[in-house]
Amino acid sequence: KDTGADDGEETPSIEVQEEALRFHIDLACESGKALMIHNREADADLLRVLADAPQPESVILHCFSSPLDVAKESLDRGYVLSFAGNVTFKRNEELREAARIAPPEQILVETDAPYMTPEPFRGARNEPAFVGYTAACVAEQRGLAPEALGELVTGNAARIYGIDLGM
């Protein structure tokens, strides 16, 4: 499950969210597990809390959708950017730029199903089978074959989540 900051209309106050986020940061630090961050239009609050808290082993910015300056700051802090279908949307050139500049070890791809359906299926319910379209877009941005990106993000996921792939 994710935790984080959401400045949407029907969300708890940022103070309540911050308290929950700090609890989850402590839990991630104590357990050695990755911290999966949800962020919607709350970049400044989120970055402030993360800068002011203990650093978990891995911080993943799930369904990354923030501006390029936030991507750069997040990457500088060692956070992982997880790209969803929104990276394929025509208007999201900054997300594609973030995919280009991210160090290889700081990239993941995801579906965020049932939301953020990638092109060419935008508007339909997102399905796990569509993650290949997101991966293909990120691969193209990085000048990689989709298979190479698949190997890269599989290795990253195994490292971040402590999964032994038996290879």
Indicate residue ranges for each PLM-predicted region:
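Active-site glycine- and acidic-residue-rich loops that bind
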Residues: 82-97
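Short acidic/histidine-rich active-site segments
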Residues: 105-127
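Mid-to-C-terminal alpha-helical segments outside catalytic/metal-binding sites
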Residues: 130-167
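Active-site metal-binding loops of divalent metal-dependent hydrolases
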Residues: 39, 63, 79, 86-87, ...
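Short, structured coil segments at secondary-structure junctions
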Residues: 77, 102-103
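Divalent metal-binding pocket/active-site signature
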Residues: 1-77, 97, 120-129, 144-146, ...
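Solvent-exposed polar/charged
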Residues: 29, 100-101, 140, 159
